[in-house]
Amino acid sequence: MKELNDLINEQVYIESLDDFDKHILQHISIEYRPKSWILLEKFGIYPGLEETANAVYSKIYQEYSFTKEYKAGKFELTMYKKDFEGIPNIFFEKLHLKVDLTKDSGSSYVGNFSTLGDNMLFDCVTIEINVGLVEVEKYLMHELLHAYQDWQMQLKGIKRFVLDRDSLYSKIMKPTKQYYETVLSAILYYTLKSELNAYCAQLSGELKMIKDTIESPNDMVKALKQTDSYRGYSLLLNIVNRYDRNELSKEEIDIVTNKCNEILNKSRNAEETFKFLKKRLESSIRKLDNIIGKLCTENLNCSYFTAPSNLFSNYLF
């Protein structure tokens, strides 16, 4: 049974959430009650994450053959707990990988296949990964972090991490031909707390890959501005700022405003909508700032200088 202080702390945390995050929690198919799983591991990275991703990456390229023809450009492989001997926090008995060789697909954790076994590990974790992606390891870290979050929730009795078709998440990620609807979806997606955790894990992987090129604070800034996380937030924030600069047409403004109201069940006007979106993005960027110095210290050869504060927000705001 949980200590009284734990329950109090969880309730305080839930009450501190803004309406957007509460709305998300109420629309996903999990029990809505105080739950400390939202906090998860510090920085969204658990011990063993990088080693697990590296082992998976190595296995993919051991199995892949440049001379073999693959049906529909895909192949599948399975790894077992014993394949990760010596790596901490292996939370599954089996890891099933669906590997796509095309350049147009992304990566995803397929959570509906994850169920707890008698030993309290997932029987099987399924991840879809595209080996056409640059720096595959960081995407593996991203999806493994989602799987780990799911495992943590199910250990604590949360029903599912998988979301209903009619959930807010599904509405956010619904494919669309409208460019600004896609932008809106990306903004809402990037500011989900679960995604921010995963991007922290991904950013950690990106930093490790470039650590040998970092010799000064200027090198660090240049490197960080090339990461997917920085470029993604920069692009989205710039589009929102175009509204403030009167660079969006009425049609573009109406598309974003109407779609945002539809998804969130609100009736905001255009000014309120763009102010809300900008606030969401800036809040997420500041959260990345809070952990970036720690990540730089852990992942880069920079013990002899201090990581500049507010790295992301200094260059984005």
Q: Which residues does each predicted region cover?
A:
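Enriched but not universal
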Residues: 1-15, 312-317
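Long, well-structured alpha-helical subdomains associated
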Residues: 16, 23-24, 33-37, 43-44, ...
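Auxiliary, metal-adjacent structural segments of Zn-dependent hydrolase domains
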Residues: 18-121, 132
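Structural signature of transmembrane alpha-helix termini at the membrane-water interface
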Residues: 26-27, 148-151, 218
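Short pre-active-site segment immediately N-terminal to the catalytic Zn-binding motif
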Residues: 124-140
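Post-HEXXH active-site segment of zinc metalloproteases
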Residues: 134, 150-184
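Active-site recognition of the HExxH zinc-binding catalytic motif
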Residues: 138-151, 198
